[in-house]
A protein has these predicted regions:
Chain A
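Transmembrane beta-barrel domains of Gram-negative outer membranes and organellar outer membranes
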Residues: 28-245
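Cleavable N-terminal signal peptides
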Residues: 15-16, 26
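N-terminal secretory signal peptides that target proteins for export/translocation
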Residues: 1-8
Length: 245, 115
């Protein structure tokens, strides 16, 4: 994901020099909190997805009430590959919400579910910001392991960002989720995020509802709390995904 | 000398013959087959050993795709028309685990019985 904090800094009139010299804040690249991906792909499956993130940090007005919204359309091309296109919008609180970036995403399922001790996949992402010549590419290793009703998922991402107005750099992120499969409509989970200048953990709940005609609606909602002084105090995340064939 | 080599070679062969099948069984595990015909699962009840990982091969004999779906088994797999899919299930505690075909849920019903 591109750095909405950087975008916010640019829009709010902060001098570019100030942005470049505040790496801990601005180039935290910030919004590490995102969904935790499983490594699975279903052929022919179409999906509409809305992801929303709202940051709350009373100590930092520049970040407080920052919103990032992603609207995606996806399709399963085969039993190994799926793709998704996103439009990404941000709203810094004072500014209007507008579409600022687009992202292409491809997921590659490497192993059959349950075949080995863990299931594996790879996620490839390429994001372009419209207003500025700014790009980010990332490859993420997806791993999932079951222990009865418990499911542990890990996403380890290696990304590179470049553009005229930012310093090109490599970055890594780790996202972990431990989930208990209580029932299809309600599953509690704990998530943990580590990125450049970000540490956060918090509870998430998720559920699915099936409709006739092989349609389903999945939702996730949670709050990730910053674990150090640099990370935002709260990152509220919501995901709604409608899947159909 | 030649006799010694021959004996060692025979010992090596015998050793391989005893190890290879054991390894194949250990690596392969139980295999169970399931067919989808006219939007029905055949058989509709699969008996598998408990506490053992099972390789389930699902043949979709219909021309239309079907989705093997089971929250209890934590499995979801689309099988294209006229093709097959491999689904690994378990190890399962003894019990019954229902599954259904999400494209034809009224007819495509079944369960795995682990015992």
């Amino acid at each position: 994901m591109l750095h909405p904090w950087f975008k916010y800094g640019s829009q709010s009139g902060l001098p570019l020099a100030a942005i470049l010299f505040l790496p801990a804040l601005v180039l935290a690249d910030g919004v590490v909190v995102d969904r935790v991906y499983d490594p699975y792909v279903q052929p022919l499956e179409k999906e509409l997805e809305w992801r929303s993130l709202v940051v709350g940090d009373a100590e930092d007005p520049a970040l407080d009430r920052l919103q990032v919204h992603r609207l995606g359309v996806g399709y399963g091309f085969s039993d190994r590959w799926s793709g998704e296109i996103y439009l990404i919008g941000a709203d810094g609180g004072d500014s209007e919400l507008e579409v600022e970036a687009a992202e292409l995403e491809a997921k590659w399922q490497l192993t059959e579910q349950g075949e080995y001790a863990a299931d594996w996949g790879l996620l490839f992402e390429l994001e372009k910001e419209f207003g500025e010549n700014q790009w980010e590419g990332a490859t993420t290793l997806l791993a999932l392991r079951e222990w009865g009703r418990w499911v542990g998922t890990a996403n380890l991402a290696l990304g590179y960002e470049w553009g005229r107005e930012i310093e090109s750099e490599w970055e890594t992120e780790l996202r972990l989720q431990g989930r208990y499969r209580l029932q299809e409509s309600f599953e509690p989970a704990l998530e943990f995020y580590v990125g450049e200048d970000y540490r956060g953990a918090g509870p998430v709940i998720r559920g699915s509802h099936r409709f006739t005609g092989a349609r389903s609606l999945t939702w996730e909602f949670g709050v990730i709390l910053g674990l150090d002084g640099v990370s935002p105090e709260q990152s509220w995340r919501l995901l709604v995904e409608y899947e159909f064939f | 000398m030649i006799e010694k080599i021959r004996k060692n070679y025979l010992s090596f062969l015998l050793c391989c013959m005893s190890i290879v099948p054991a390894a194949a069984i250990a690596a392969g595990g139980p295999v169970v087959e399931l067919e989808i015909i006219n939007h029905l699962f055949h058989p509709s009840e699969l008996i598998v050993p408990a506490n053992t990982k099972v390789k389930l091969i699902v043949y979709n004999r219909d021309q239309t795709p079907e989705e093997f779906e089971s929250y209890e088994l934590n499995r979801e797999k689309v099988i294209m028309g006229g093709q097959r899919a491999i689904i690994f299930i378990g190890p399962l505690a003894p019990g019954e685990y229902p599954f259904f075909g999400e494209f034809n849920p009224r007819t495509a019903q079944g369960k795995v019985i682990a015992q």
